[in-house]
Amino acid sequence: MIIWGVTAFNHDTSIAVIEDNNLKFYEHVRGKDIDPKLAQRAIRSTHAGPSVIAWFERPWVKKTRQAYAGQWDAVRDMSVLPSAWAKQCSVDYAKIVTHPHHKSHAAAGFFTSPFDEATVVVVDAIGEWDTATIWHGKDGELKKMWSSSYPNSIGLFYSAFTKLLGFTPIKEEYKLQQLAEHGNASRFYDRVNSYFKYPTVLRTSLHRGVWDWEQPNEKDRADIAAAVQAVFSKQIDWIMTRAYSETRCSNLVYVGGCAMNSEYNKKLYQMWDQVYSIPNPGDPMSAIGAALLTTNTRAKLNGKEVKHLELKVLA
């Protein structure tokens, strides 16, 4: 059986191909919501199309959140459903299964990790409703232990301030992180921290940005960025502490868009015995996670279990 894990319609698209429980192909295309040529390359990797398409999120559940947020154009848009993707890529003969967004993240990390047991932490802007989750990976299973839901989101908090500072949200958060290195966090720390009522819970939704802050001048930008990075770190610290208390396992798998914050990640080795993440912990590699959830197996290459994912052997 050939299973495709797929992510799409998030400005990028990716496909992972599993045949007979072996990972045969993975490729990520930037800047395209859909790419039929990528599908053709995936077909060539196994000389056949998919029997099953494993979608990285549950789009109908996502639409309930979009309705809650008043995003009615998104709710009515049927062109972003997996069936529409399959038709455009000429693989609409395949069965389609869907998996929760955060569970796809968690599976991409845990099922390619060197650990038989791990604490799995997923933090991003938003999935269907989940924005941060803690999982216990053990005996080939993932059990959700805790979650934070929209509109509370550390990822959206960081993206909102990315926009305030003149960068592109969900794309240029790394520029805020770099700018923070040149700032004084104490100047604006209290004001930035006040957006949280208590750990992981925002006072107001920041999905559409920070609207109660004047446009910062050049002198203030670095100090605001430094404060945002400091508050972000404090919030992730709380999640990491909660994660260990839930699982009592000192092996960490950390994935999701927020796991790309390299400045924070330096702290992880002080908090955990062993730490693992995938080369791209954001949405694209959730294609691998969705495929592995469908096969209910750890990743294998050439019949051997993957103990540390190396993308160069997949594409």
How would you label these PLM feature ranges?
Residues M1-A315:
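Short acidic/glycine-rich loops and adjacent helix/strand connectors
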